[in-house]
A protein has these predicted regions:
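Asp-box/BNR beta-propeller blade signature and adjacent active/binding-site loops
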Residues: 1-282
Length: 282
């Protein structure tokens, strides 16, 4: 296996690379975004491009100061071909001898395949609640939704936009449980949204339960598939999901912190049951 990115390429020192995100624009090279640094408050964004489907890669390009690129989940491409990336920052605030962690979600927009960038947000103030690692969904009716993990309420939180991501409504909880764990989502070719997440429940389940849900409107969700369900000392986390041109859905995730698992699903074969009151149906 060939190493594609190294933290030392631009920094000149042995430093970690984090959270790689692949994105294929409608036209232009394949893009690989990643973070470089010792930890979240200190890291910066870099990216590379490939014109031969990932066989070879350009030299690393550092994003402008203050820009990190898509923090965990892939960007989306808008109708005007601008690329909109869900991003977020994490840092520690010390006040009255008390240290608290602050998570702020924002968006990063490029109209020229990464040459220049514009920031939208932050979308939360970090005072009432923290949200990070958003997934962007653009529905056929023109509305846009961002779904984020949060420390609070053991729910996935959401915000909505009616103007292609320029402005956003107030945050609210979805009905979907989540144990402060990473998620990912994709719009299917048939116009439905598909979400991969840990559907934790009130019985104390955590990251040992990994699920797939779908929705037509981002409000009412339906259970579609259970990827993992192993009670005990197991962890299945940090999913990534895409749909390929043949219609199949490809999902990768960390399998018990030992390896990466790849699952292929046919969304035409889903047998859907409505998720009511946050309970995964039998």
């Amino acid at each position: 296996m060939e190493k594609v990115a190294s933290g030392s390429e631009l920094s000149g020192r042995n430093v970690a690379c984090w959270n790689p995100v692949l994105f294929q624009p409608k036209s232009g090279p394949l893009m690989l975004f990643y973070k470089v640094g010792d930890d979240e408050p200190e890291w910066w964004g870099e990216y590379k491009t490939s014109s031969d489907e990932g066989k070879t890669w350009s030299k690393a390009i550092r994003l402008p100061d203050g820009f990190l690129g898509p923090i965990k989940n892939k960007p989306i491409q808008l109708s005007d071909d601008c690329i909109l990336s869900p991003s977020s920052i994490e840092y520690y605030k010390i006040q009255n001898n008390d240290t608290s962690e602050v998570w702020l979600t924002h968006l990063e927009l490029t109209s020229d395949l990464g040459k220049t960038w514009k920031k939208i947000g932050p979308l939360n103030d970090g005072k009432d609640f923290n949200v990070i690692q958003g997934s962007l969904l653009s529905y056929p009716n023109g509305k846009m939704q961002i779904l984020c993990r949060t420390e609070y309420a053991r729910r996935i939180y959401q915000s909505w936009s009616n103007d292609q991501g320029k402005t956003w409504n107030s945050w609210s909880p979805t009905e979907l449980p989540n144990p402060d764990s990473g998620t990912d989502a994709v719009m299917l070719a048939d116009g439905r949204a598909l979400l991969v997440y840990n559907h934790s429940t009130s019985d104390g389940r955590d990251r040992d339960y990994l699920n797939v849900a779908v929705s037509k409107d981002g409000k009412k969700w339906y259970a579609a598939y259970v990827l993992e369900n192993q009670k005990g000392d197991f962890e299945f986390s940090y999913p990534a999901v895409i749909q390929t041109s043949d219609g199949f859905v490809h999902i990768t995730y960390t399998w018990n912190r030992e390896r990466i698992k790849h699952v292929v699903l046919d969304p035409k074969k889903f047998v859907l049951k409505e998720i009511q009151n946050g309970v995964w149906p039998e």
